[in-house]
């Protein structure tokens, strides 16, 4: 019974708990529902409030935008009205100007018409005068024929001859004036081109000697060079062809000879013998052969260097070798290779200024004295020898060939490059310090120059100036006429060319001055 009672209690307790749970759930549901309804209502109210505020704000924005749009429309309309007023005013001004121009044109047209009428009247008057003149001329001719007994054709021929003489005189004066003007312009342009070439090209130059000095380690070496009974020095001079001068100069000997190549070979031979220390005839010949090969290599290398520096291509190897030989040639103390390089550069600059081919000018300038490399071995002038050598070694450019053969006037040429080479050659040779000559021969040449000038009849005074490059001659005006001075200048030039040896050219300037003096009392 006790167990049943406990079971019932448990059941009742469980039932009460379930009932309480159901009641609590229901009450919680009702509470949550009420809370949810209250929240929803509050959210709806808030949403309504936000919507109302948004409507109010949108209305305010709408009013503000409308106001701004109205203001912009008003401003645009005002701007448009202002532009329209300005355009209208501008059109009115333009219209007024057009009206003024039309009025001016009308006035000018009226003036032109008036002048045209006056001109027509003048033309009529002139025609009338011409008719009267023709009538008078006809009457005059008839009267002249009656008085002179000449026909009209005969009188016409006399007048034409007179007019022809006057016209010839005027034409001669005009031609002389134009020739003088052209000559002055040409001289001016030539001076400008030559001055520019000289300014753009500058080179160092040292005059060459005809002797070479070899330094010795001590004076005892002189005895070894001479050898027993002079056999070493004799062998040396025989093999090299150069004089070996041994004097009192301490620790030095002198090599003398007119051929610079042989002198250079002899110098190298002697230096090698001194360095080796063994000096006897067989050794001299051996060292001579070595020195000769070295100089030949130096000649070839020198030619190749010069050709490369000047940018000249397609030269025959023998011509390159001859160019290198020019390093050991001199003319009035001036190194011929240095002179040829200088001529090539100056001619190239002048050719560029004249719009000519610079490479042809440089090529002709470098080769113009190529004949001097062999002119002591071959008969003839160096210009013609050089011309033959260039042709032999496949130089085909006719301008280059003519410049080589004709740069001293020994053959007739038509090439402008020949004139360029002559000018560049004269510039290189004539500049101060380029060439030299002994004082004695220089003074004798100046004296001879003045003697030639003074030997002509009518010469009052003659002065050699510009270091003998110009002779200025004053003649007696009562003995020599203007026509005679031209002939005299030409005769003096011929005498100078036939009797004097000189570098460059000599200008012969014959001056005839006439003075008339009167006194006013």
Swiss-Prot record:
Residues 210-270 form the KH domain. GO terms for biological process: mRNA catabolic process. It comes from the Bacteria. It is found in: Cell membrane. It holds the Pfam family RNase_Y_N. It is a single-pass membrane protein. This is Ribonuclease Y. It comes from Caldicellulosiruptor saccharolyticus (strain ATCC 43494 / DSM 8903 / Tp8T 6331).
């Amino acid at each position: 019974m006790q167990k049943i009672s406990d079971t019932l209690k448990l059941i009742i307790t469980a039932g009460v708990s379930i009932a309480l749970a159901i009641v609590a759930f229901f009450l919680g549901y009702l509470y949550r529902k009420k809370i949810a309804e209250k929240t929803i209502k509050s959210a709806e109210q808030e949403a309504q409030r936000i919507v109302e505020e948004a409507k109010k704000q949108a209305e305010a924005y709408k009013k503000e935008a409308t106001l701004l749009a109205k203001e912009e429309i008003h401003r645009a309309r005002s701007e448009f009205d202002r532009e329209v007023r300005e355009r209208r005013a501008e059109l009115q001004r333009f219209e007024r100007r057009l009206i003024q121009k039309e009025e001016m044109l009308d006035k000018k047209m009226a003036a032109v018409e008036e002048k045209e009428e006056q001109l027509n009247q003048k033309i009529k008057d002139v025609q009338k005068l011409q008719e009267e003149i023709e009538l008078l001329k006809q009457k005059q001719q008839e009267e002249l024929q009656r008085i002179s007994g000449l026909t009209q054709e005969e009188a016409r021929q006399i007048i034409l001859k007179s007019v022809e003489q006057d016209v010839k005189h005027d034409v001669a004066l005009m031609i002389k004036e134009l020739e003088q003007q052209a000559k002055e312009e040409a001289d001016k342009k030539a001076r400008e081109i030559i001055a520019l070439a000289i300014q753009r090209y500058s080179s160092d130059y040292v005059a060459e000697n005809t002797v070479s000095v070899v330094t010795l380690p001590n004076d005892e070496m002189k005895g070894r060079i001479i050898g027993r009974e002079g056999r070493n020095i004799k062998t040396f001079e025989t093999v090299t062809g150069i004089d070996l001068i041994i004097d009192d100069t301490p620790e030095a000997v002198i090599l003398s000879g007119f051929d610079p190549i042989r002198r250079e070979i002899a110098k190298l031979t002697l230096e090698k013998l001194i360095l080796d220390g063994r000096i006897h005839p067989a050794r001299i010949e051996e060292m001579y052969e070595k020195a000769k090969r070295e100089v030949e290599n130096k000649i070839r290398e020198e030619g190749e260097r010069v050709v490369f520096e000047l940018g000249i291509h397609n030269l025959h190897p023998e011509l390159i070798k001859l160019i290198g030989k020019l390093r050991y040639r001199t003319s009035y103390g001036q190194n011929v290779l240095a002179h040829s390089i200088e001529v090539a550069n100056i001619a190239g600059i002048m050719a560029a200024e004249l719009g000519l081919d610079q490479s042809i000018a440089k090529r002709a300038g470098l080769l113009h004295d190529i004949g001097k490399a062999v002119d002591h071995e071959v008969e003839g002038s160096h210009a013609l020898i050089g011309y033959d050598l260039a042709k032999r070694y496949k130089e085909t450019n006719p301008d280059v060939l003519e410049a080589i053969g004709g740069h001293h006037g020994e053959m007739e040429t038509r090439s402008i490059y020949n004139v360029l080479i002559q000018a560049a050659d004269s510039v290189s040779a004539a500049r101060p310090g380029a060439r030299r000559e002994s004082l004695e021969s220089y003074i004798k040449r100046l004296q001879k120059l003045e003697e030639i000038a003074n030997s002509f009849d009518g010469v009052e005074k003659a002065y050699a100036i510009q270091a003998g490059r110009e002779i200025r001659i004053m003649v007696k005006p009562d003995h020599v006429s203007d026509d005679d001075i031209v002939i005299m200048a030409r005769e003096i030039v011929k005498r100078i060319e036939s009797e004097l040896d000189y570098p460059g050219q000599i200008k012969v300037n014959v001056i005839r001055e006439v003075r008339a003096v009167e006194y006013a009392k």
